[in-house]
Amino acid sequence: MAAEQGLANAGRGAQSPAAAAPVPGRFVVFAIVSLALLMASVDQTIVATALPALQHDLHAQVNWSSWTITIYALGQILVMPLAGKIGDQYGRKRIFLGAAVLFTTASLCCGFANDIYLLIVLRACQAIGGGAFMPSATGIVAQIFGPNRDRAVGLFASIFPIGGIIGPVLGGVFVTYWSWRGIFLVNVPIGIALVTLGAVFIPASARNRGQRLDISGILLLGATLLSAMFGIAYLGSGASSPADPAFLVPECAAAVALILFVRHCARAPAPFVSVRFLAGHGFGVMNLLNFLFGSAALGFAALVPLYAQERYGLATLAAGTLLTARAAGMIATAGLAVFLLRRTGYRWPILVGFTLTAVGLLAIAASPPGVSAYGWMALAAGVCGVGMGVSTPAANNATLQLAPDQAAAVAGLRGMFRQSGSITAVSITAAIAARSADPGMAQAHVFLVFAAILLCALPLILLVPEHRGRW
């Protein structure tokens, strides 16, 4: 979902004179940047399957090992808007190649990390590279395809979900037949090829130095999420209680940073997020729903492989394929949901989708009724995927229609709230599991809470801006 921000920015570079006609060799360039996007998207999910092996080798608790997932998402939230604007100012090719070098170097170092804290820092570096790939690559595609940029960008956007299917399975293969270190080292030869081919084939782009970067806003948002994550992780270590200053100080710092972030957005001339997009007409309810959806649906995706291994003892490769069932459910229904949007409007698909996702979460948490654990969880994951496929297009359009002339900013806002929800859910769940004598059952109880949150949010859907037909 974080990728939406970069993908939505495609139209900005498309208006330059350089984009007036298709560029020779554009299909080679398309293949290069598509491979980069696929690599970055795979790294969003590949670590989830490898968490137990990673924890064992690095002697880490789940509350800290889960940071290898959440820090990657956090880094992308913060980097993508920066990378998009810097690419416009200094050239997308430079940003793309710099991102490829950073991502490849960080991947190599991740593969040889012998400490969980060092691995977390290196994953943050990976996130900077991966987050910069998306807006720069999308701008390159929009530039080189000229009048056909709409179809090219649409096809390019469809590549990102493929990583969600490949990642967990690929992670399971590496852990089963080699080592968790392989999930990072596999990026190195690919990254070297990207840098070499990109330097030769990607054309330079025009520069636009008229945009300002809201560094203060991005730092305040980063401080909010990072402080909250740190306090929750420390609580999960079992060395503190909710009354311990080691927990309270970071959480209070997060609250202060959040207040300052909102205040900054209200006063800055060119804020990272317009205050109108935070609480303006229709935005408040959509932001809340996107946050809750990210907590339940995206947090679920990050945690299911670990849950399957800890509660049922499933093999790593089998646990990874559970997310393939979720992705299959999404793919099977999302296209139909998009086709029917003009007839159904937005509220009904979101209502049905949230309900189905909640049912899937309830099933995941329940004990298998006389069937294999793998079969039951695959079915439940598929139901969650169907729910996500039904609701996501409607939620996307309902948010975009609030400000169709600022689609890039709105898509980025939507991705920010969903990823923030995911980060919050994974951090809290990991802390609870780390303090529990039975981590598998603890995660099952968290899935029940996720389901309850989605069901309690159903009345809010009545406040979603409704629309049928074209817009």
Show which residues each predicted segment covers.
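C-terminal membrane-cytosol helix-exit motif in multi-pass small-molecule transporters
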Residues: 188-207, 222-234, 253-268, 457-465
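12-transmembrane solute porter fold
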Residues: 25-42, 47-51, 62-71, 82, ...
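Helix-loop-helix hairpin linking two adjacent transmembrane segments in secondary transporters
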Residues: 162-196, 213-251
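Short loop segments and helix-boundary regions at transmembrane helix junctions
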Residues: 27, 149, 202-219, 239-243, ...
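Residue-level signal for the membrane-embedded core of alpha-helical transmembrane segments
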Residues: 78, 132, 193, 223-226, ...
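Transmembrane-helix bundle of Major Facilitator Superfamily
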Residues: 2-200, 336, 343-344, 352-355, ...
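Interfacial helix-loop-helix linkers and transmembrane-helix boundary segments
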Residues: 87-94, 148-152, 207-213, 271-274, ...
